[in-house]
Design a protein with these regions (language model features):
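Long, low-complexity, charged/polar intrinsically disordered regions in eukaryotic proteins
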Residues: 1-33
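Short helix-coil-helix linker/hinge
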Residues: 37-45
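Hydrophobic residues on short alpha-helical segments
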Residues: 48-49
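Short acidic, hydrophobic short linear motifs in intrinsically disordered regions
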Residues: 53-66
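Short amphipathic alpha-helical interaction segments
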Residues: 66-82
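A short, conserved structural fragment
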Residues: 81-92
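Short, amphipathic alpha-helical interaction segments positioned at domain boundaries
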Residues: 93-138
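Long, Pro/Ser/Thr-rich low-complexity/intrinsically disordered regulatory tracts in eukaryotic proteins
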Residues: 127-179
Length: 179
């Protein structure tokens, strides 16, 4: 991907991310802004694009699909795992498997906001982008519901989360409003 501009790489990588998960969706300006918000360097975009054809890969597969060295793959996947874009976990046989996650529905959004939040401008901006993306996806689903109905019928049941006001040790949870 060396002959692509940074913006073209960003759009291509966002397209790969948008194809992940149970419900792939089209690339939007909002999705591009979210990926731009969390990706630290251009090489991470190249790593994301290595998952274009196969969303879960071993180190050997990633070496082939990305063209990166093992050391570079370790560095990039660790960085992307910290942002919530890659899930890296050993398989039952002990082989490390790297999986590209979607933006939403158990992906970047959930991992990004599962940790302790500071209320920083960066967190607020990202939360606003995710809120906008969810509204766009809602509108997309509503306008194409009949075509998407078979996907919903075959999808596993969604987990339900009941928000708590206190932690297990009795401390109040600070809820940061986006308004």
């Amino acid at each position: 991907m060396t002959n692509l501009s940074s913006d073209e790489k960003l759009k291509k990588a966002t397209g790969v991310v948008c194809k992940q998960g149970l419900f792939p969706f089209p690339v939007s300006e909002t999705a591009i802004r979210i990926v731009k918000h969390v990706v630290a360097e251009e090489a991470e975009l190249d790593m994301i694009c290595a998952f274009k054809d196969v969303p879960s890969q071993t180190m050997d597969q990633l070496k082939e699909s990305s063209g990166f060295s093992e050391e570079t793959i370790e560095k990039l996947t660790t960085s992307l795992a910290k942002t919530g874009l890659i899930f890296n976990q050993p398989s039952s046989t002990g082989v490390m498997v790297y999986r590209l996650l979607p933006l939403v529905m158990i992906g970047l959004m959930e991992y990004k906001f599962m940790t302790k939040l500071t209320g920083s401008n960066e967190e607020r901006e990202l939360a606003e982008l995710f809120e906008k993306l969810l509204m766009e996806l809602r509108d997309e689903v509503q306008s194409n519901y009949t075509a998407l109905e078979p996907l919903f019928a075959s999808a596993p049941q969604a987990d339900r989360t009941v928000p708590a006001r206190q932690t297990d040790d009795g401390k109040n949870i600070n809820i940061i409003k986006v308004d």
